[in-house]
Amino acid sequence: MDEDLDRLSQREREVLRLIARGYAYKEVAKELFISIKTVETHVSSVLRKLQLSNRHQLTRWATDRRLV
């Protein structure tokens, strides 16, 4: 498994996969039964841990690693 992926919590990985599939924050929240604010927090954490700047880079990162 990718070392960068190991840095993420299980929930962060779930959020990452859904965001990379094109889900909106509201859709991720509904799918995972969490608040939109919690989704935003997880996305910010993932971006920071992976040293990415935006959702586009996040999607590219996940696609390159065949997570979606």
Annotate each predicted stretch with a short phrase.
Residues 1-38, 65:
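Helix-turn-helix DNA-binding segment
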Residues 11, 42, 57:
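Short Gly/charged-rich anion-binding patches and loops
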Residues 26, 44, 56:
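Residues within the helices of the helix-turn-helix
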Residues 31, 42-45:
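Residues within the DNA-recognition helix of helix-turn-helix
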Residues 47-68:
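Basic, Lys/Arg-enriched C-terminal extension of HTH/homeodomain DNA-binding domains
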